[in-house]
Amino acid sequence: MNVGDLKSANDLYESVRSIEGVTGVHLFRIRDAGILKSTMIPELDALTTISLDELNKSPTVFTKNLLQGCGGTDLDVPAELKRLVIFVCNILESCNEFTDLGSARLLRLTFDSCQLVIMYDSLFVVAITKDET
């Protein structure tokens, strides 16, 4: 990882923090960048895989509480976030409802009156929680 990557990620972090309605921004460095490559998604058993059915039945699975206290660029990826990233990758495998941001990808998940926005590339995950207005 070079300093430019960290600087651009931090710039992104600072810019989205000031958007109205944003209730949390969480920046994570991915130590195992391979986890974000669809061909390298680890095989998981049913207990650790989060399905769309689960999300529909329990729309609070991915609330900001999942990510609180985990912010920073120097932490290992928490197990819960790994599950979330894998879940996002699984969605991307089954549909094309994401926006191409150059080398990054964007996915929005909406639940209740809140949105969880996941942006990721090979080095970072930025998770943003935003109240819908």
Swiss-Prot record:
Subcellular localization(s) per the UniProt record: Cytoplasm; Nucleus
Gene Ontology CC annotations of this record: cytosol; nucleus
Superkingdom, taxonomy of origin: Eukaryota
BP term (GO), one: meiotic cell cycle
UniProt KW keywords: Cytoplasm, Meiosis, Nucleus
Function: Has a role in meiosis.
Protein name: Meiotically up-regulated gene 15 protein
Native organism: Schizosaccharomyces pombe (strain 972 / ATCC 24843)
Lineage per the UniProt record: Eukaryota, Fungi, Dikarya, Ascomycota, Taphrinomycotina
Gene: mug15
